[in-house]
From Swiss-Prot:
Cofactor note: Binds 2 magnesium or manganese ions per subunit.
Protein name per Swiss-Prot or TrEMBL: Probable alpha-L-glutamate ligase
Domain ATP-grasp, chain residue ranges per copy: 104-287
Class of enzymatic activity (EC top level): ligase
Gene label: rimK
Keywords: ATP-binding, Ligase, Magnesium, Manganese, Metal-binding, Nucleotide-binding, Protein biosynthesis
InterPro entries (UniProt xref): ATP-grasp, ATP-grasp_RimK-type, ATP_grasp_subdomain_1, RimK, Rimk_N, Rp_bS6_RimK/Lys_biosynth_LsyX
Amino acid sequence: MKIAILSRDGALYSCKRLREAAEARKHSVEIIDPLSCYMNINSAAPSVHYRGRRLDKYDAVIPRIGSQITFYGTAVLRQFEMLGSYPLNNSVAVIRARDKLHSLQLLAREGIDLPITGFAHSPDDTGDLIAMVGGAPLVVKLVEGTQGIGVVLAETRQAAESVIDAFRGLNAHILVQEYVREAQGKDIRCLVIGNRVVAAIERQAKAGEFRSNLHRGGSANNVKITAQERAIAIKATKTLGLNVAGVDILRADRGPLVMEVNASPGLEGIETTTGFDIAGMMIEFIEQNTQRRFATSASISKS
């Protein structure tokens, strides 16, 4: 197969591993910067051009699109879909997952347990917003944040009001969530491919920090997840229409709570911790689904 990886930086661990895994299975791979693509959008002969040349058709495309370029990156991904490439995650699902509010609303609608969450733009009554989610301590997030950026733990009501007022000054959308104290700065990252949780790790925030993101100095260990945690990770992935996702879960006294569903999960932490070939599993999933698609197309053409 010919596989395109959409990424701004082919030197990143995840991109390198996906390329290695695909080439080990005798596929040709090209890493393409989506911001260097431009598109011809028409009904007769749509195309994608890249750095002065028209790109050939790819059998599959793997989106590794950073949150900062979601709009243009998913437009490029959508163009590849128009041309018949199989997407590891399709553009609609990626956009859905990147919209934190929309994704939480979809998960809640499907009965998936979440931390109590409030959403606001410029609340006139900060006190009511804080009370709505159970009071302090609570976590205040910028909707556009990633990897723990724009996330603040407010230990007291006064601190929460100050943080919310500061974020309001940025003219930003704000998520306010209950702080799950019993999680003790830990969460579980479940890596879902298709209908399976193929790996899971427990992430622990570093001393003095409440965010467990590995990019912020957190540590990771192997963990055995429960059947309930496995089921909720798969359901959350399917609810957003994703084939592959990193689902972050908090262990609360009332049961597992989904914090976030990541459409482009990093592979370094989970591969190095578990020793599993996650990249290889992703390529195998693509193989199975492109073969199924080609078989279906052949059957339709014969009929």
